[in-house]
Amino acid sequence: NAALYQFLGLVFKNEKINDERIEIPAIEGDMGGKKYYMFSIEPDLLLKIGFVLHRAKANESEFPTYQRLLQPARLKGITKFINDGGYFPNSIIVNFSGKNKNKLHFEFFKTTKNSSSKLGVLKITNAYAIAYIIDGQHRLYGYANSQYKDSNTIPVVAFDGLDSIEQLQLFMDINENQKAVSATLRLDLEEDLYWDSPVAASRLKALRSSII
């Protein structure tokens, strides 16, 4: 479960799981003067190599810590959503910190005349807690108890070598500039989404949304 993955990361941080590198097709790009990689990975793998800097005593040696503790009720809801066929197409954002040198190796294959992005294979050391989860912790840990943690693949944007202050700034930028869907817009969208649903309860939900 989610607690087990966090425990493994805390106790065995930076220790190899095995000597075989994880190899993933990836795209290398630059954004804001920072190098990053885009790839798709099975949640179980990312849960092992990822780690969340929670604001807790266990992480006092790491500074700054910026993530709130995982919420069990929210995780349970996300797990059910995933097991019922739901999915989140937005990327998990991680950082392989400068402390973890040589954890990444990008094997370049190809580029095109239309883009400076590079296509290749990203080789990642298979070790616990080498990538900090900056955004998407609940989406990721929602897979911990899911039947799809080994078969689904989730999108990831991975930075290489952001320092702790840059990580904190990125976390703040993401959370300050994201805007939640307003209650009014949500009702309008639910009406459109469920109006012709074959499920009676969903059609009733659409009707309620149109009346409110």
Per-range role (PLM):
Residues 1-89, 96-103:
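N-terminal extension/subdomain marker
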Residues 1, 87-212:
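Basic- and aromatic-enriched surface patches that contact anionic nucleotides/nucleic acids
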